[in-house]
């Protein structure tokens, strides 16, 4: 079973359908007991970082996620950004699970970064075109396992311990997106 954290901001229905299409049972929850029983946890998200953190803190999700070390926690789009320490969007702290910060995209290309872009990575699964919609990005770091070139390097997938971030929308990225999501649910793209 996959637990999708329902904190009130997210692309829950599309992500739920994608995970079910991969053959998993899904539960929408904020309950610690459900999360403890899950094989993996997904934190989806669309919207403003500050609003998301306010909702997460109201529902005591931050402490719950900080205590999980034995299964993948996957953040998608805004959910990936929430995994980090701080965001310039609203100047607010994140979940502080992954070192680094979220900053505005600095590119000569139009913002938001909207549409299909090719991932670049040494991992064979992470070399495909995927669908992005965002104006903020994680800073480049040693935790980036795939990036897109948008006049600047945009982290597309990060992994730090059991935390996996996917900046693009795998549920909207066709067959490759589903394969990437499935690999994340199984534990990710690097071996510790």
Curated annotation (Swiss-Prot):
One of its GO terms (cellular component) is cytoplasm. It is found in: Cytoplasm. It comes from the Bacteria. Pathway: Amino-acid biosynthesis; L-histidine biosynthesis; L-histidine from 5-phospho-alpha-D-ribose 1-diphosphate: step 5/9. The active site is at residues 77, 169, 171. GO terms for biological process: L-histidine biosynthetic process. Keywords: Amino-acid biosynthesis, Cytoplasm, Glutamine amidotransferase, Histidine biosynthesis, Hydrolase, Lyase. It catalyses: 5-[(5-phospho-1-deoxy-D-ribulos-1-ylimino)methylamino]-1-(5-phospho-beta-D-ribosyl)imidazole-4-carboxamide + L-glutamine = D-erythro-1-(imidazol-4-yl)glycerol 3-phosphate + 5-amino-1-(5-phospho-beta-D-ribosyl)imidazole-4-carboxamide + L-glutamate + H(+); L-glutamine + H2O = L-glutamate + NH4(+). InterPro entries: Class_I_gatase-like, GATASE, Imidazole-glycPsynth_HisH. Its main location: cytoplasm. GO terms for molecular function: glutaminase activity; imidazoleglycerol-phosphate synthase activity; lyase activity. Residues 1-192 form the Glutamine amidotransferase type-1 domain. Its EC number is 4.3.2.10, 3.5.1.2. Pfam families: GATase. Signal peptide: none annotated. PROSITE patterns: GATASE_TYPE_1. Heterodimer of HisH and HisF. IGPS catalyzes the conversion of PRFAR and glutamine to IGP, AICAR and glutamate. The HisH subunit catalyzes the hydrolysis of glutamine to glutamate and ammonia as part of the synthesis of IGP and AICAR. The resulting ammonia molecule is channeled to the active site of HisF. This is Imidazole glycerol phosphate synthase subunit HisH. The lineage of its organism: Bacteria, Bacillati, Bacillota, Bacilli, Bacillales. The gene is hisH.
């Amino acid at each position: 079973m996959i637990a999708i954290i329902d904190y009130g901001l997210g692309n829950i229905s599309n992500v739920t359908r994608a995970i079910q299409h991969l053959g998993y049972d899904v539960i929408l929850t904020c309950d610690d007991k459900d999360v403890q029983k899950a094989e993996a946890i997904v934190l989806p998200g669309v919207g403003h970082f500050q609003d998301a953190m306010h909702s997460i803190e109201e529902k005591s999700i931050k402490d719950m996620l900080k205590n999980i070390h034995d299964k993948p926690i996957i953040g998608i789009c805004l959910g990936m950004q929430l995994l980090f320490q701080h965001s310039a969007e609203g100047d607010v702290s994140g979940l502080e699970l992954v070192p680094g910060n979220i900053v505005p995209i600095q590119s000569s290309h139009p913002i938001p970064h909207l549409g299909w872009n090719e991932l670049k990575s040494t991992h064979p699964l992470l070399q495909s075109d995927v669908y992005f919609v965002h104006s903020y990005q994680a800073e480049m770091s040693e935790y980036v396992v795939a990036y897109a070139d948008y006049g600047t390097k945009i982290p597309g997938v990060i992994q730090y311990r059991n935390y996996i971030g996917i900046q693009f929308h795998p549920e909207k990225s066709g067959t490759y997106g589903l394969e990437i999501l499935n690999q994340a649910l199984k534990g990710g793209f690097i071996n510790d």
